[in-house]
């Protein structure tokens, strides 16, 4: 899980999801998991 100021899709399978007030990226590849912090 990477915590970044700006999250973005890395590949075509990445999905941007709002979790409460946090924007996060969920993907098949676990290395692509990100959350905004």
From Swiss-Prot:
Recorded coiled-coil stretches: none
Record-linked InterPro entries: Ribosomal_bL36 (IPR000473), Ribosomal_bL36_sp (IPR035977)
Top-level lineage group: Eukaryota
GO cellular component, one term: ribonucleoprotein complex
Gene Ontology MF annotations: structural constituent of ribosome
The keyword Membrane appears for this protein: no
Keyword Metal-binding: no
Keyword entries, A-Z: Chloroplast, Plastid, Ribonucleoprotein, Ribosomal protein
GO biological process, one term: translation
PROSITE patterns associated with the record: RIBOSOMAL_L36 (PS00828)
Cell compartments where the protein resides: Plastid, Chloroplast
Family that this chain belongs to: Belongs to the bacterial ribosomal protein bL36 family.
Name by which UniProt lists this protein: Large ribosomal subunit protein bL36c
Provenance organism: Gnetum parvifolium (Small-leaved jointfir)
């Amino acid at each position: 899980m990477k915590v970044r100021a700006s999250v973005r899709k890395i590949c075509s399978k990445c999905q941007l999801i709002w979790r409460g007030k946090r924007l996060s990226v969920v993907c098949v590849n676990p290395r692509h998991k990100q959350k905004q912090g």
